[in-house]
């Protein structure tokens, strides 16, 4: 099974036109171990980030009452699914609140400088395009499966018994056995040894 895509949501939630995209990203250390977690908010022109370091993330988890090994990504995914993400912008800073869990989690974000934000926004755009393309392929495959006719299964081996003849066509009905020529009517299955003869009407 493919791993889950990084969660994201649009803000504000609800039927209003979206103005921001909020997503998370896990960072990897050189040894391949998960080294951190960051939240991002963008309006497609500017980018805000939590800019966590391993130490600042550990301090934040301790303040939230979370263990050092606990991943915040599932909490963010659940908040996105429940539309429980709130954003507040203040000049070059932003605050993000995740509710809907045992306790609300609040994060402070700083504006990312343009040269550093550009490659991240490019990666986000390409990643979203790939996800849309993948979803369209799955949808097309599901629609093709739904409209294609289902083939009735056929028996694997040869048919051992022939169907009974149709009584309406003059054939024998079910359970009627054909009599072979010369077969005895008294003892079915035995042929008469004496040839059948006619009646002589000329005898007196």
Curated annotation (Swiss-Prot):
Changing residue 134 to D: Phospho-mimetic mutant; abolished interaction with DNA-bound the DNA-bound XRCC5/Ku80 and XRCC6/Ku70 heterodimer. It comes from the Eukaryota. Its main location: nucleus. GO terms for cellular component: cytoplasm; nonhomologous end joining complex; nucleoplasm; nucleus; site of double-strand break. GO terms for biological process: DNA damage response; double-strand break repair via nonhomologous end joining. Residues 143-204 are annotated as: Disordered. A motif (XLM) lies at residues 190-204. The modification Phosphothreonine is found at residue 145. Residues 37-79 form the PISA domain. GO terms for molecular function: DNA polymerase binding; identical protein binding; molecular adaptor activity; protein homodimerization activity. Residues 171-204 are annotated as: Mediates interaction with XRCC5/Ku80 and XRCC6/Ku70 and association with the non-homologous end joining core complex. Pfam families: PAXX. It is found in: Nucleus; Chromosome; Cytoplasm. Keywords: Chromosome, Cytoplasm, DNA damage, DNA repair, Nucleus, Phosphoprotein. The modification Phosphoserine is found at residues 134, 148, 152. Phosphorylation may inhibit interaction with the DNA-bound XRCC5/Ku80 and XRCC6/Ku70 heterodimer (Ku complex). InterPro entries: PAXX, PAXX_N. Changing residue 184 to E: Abolished interaction with XRCC5/Ku80 and XRCC6/Ku70. PANTHER family: PROTEIN PAXX. Homodimer. Interacts with the DNA-bound XRCC5/Ku80 and XRCC6/Ku70 heterodimer (Ku complex); the interaction is direct. Associated component of the non-homologous end joining (NHEJ) complex, composed of the core proteins PRKDC, LIG4, XRCC4, XRCC6/Ku70, XRCC5/Ku86 and NHEJ1/XLF. Interacts with POLL (DNA polymerase lambda); promoting POLL recruitment to double-strand breaks (DSBs) and stimulation of the end-filling activity of POLL. Non-essential DNA repair protein involved in DNA non-homologous end joining (NHEJ); participates in double-strand break (DSB) repair and V(D)J recombination. May act as a scaffold required for accumulation of the Ku heterodimer, composed of XRCC5/Ku80 and XRCC6/Ku70, at double-strand break sites and promote the assembly and/or stability of the NHEJ machinery. Involved in NHEJ by promoting the ligation of blunt-ended DNA ends. Together with NHEJ1/XLF, collaborates with DNA polymerase lambda (POLL) to promote joining of non-cohesive DNA ends. Belongs to the XRCC4-XLF family. PAXX subfamily. The N-terminus (residues 1-113) forms a head domain that is structurally related to those of XRCC4, XLF/NHEJ1, and SASS6. This is Protein PAXX. The lineage of its organism: Eukaryota, Metazoa, Chordata, Craniata, Vertebrata.
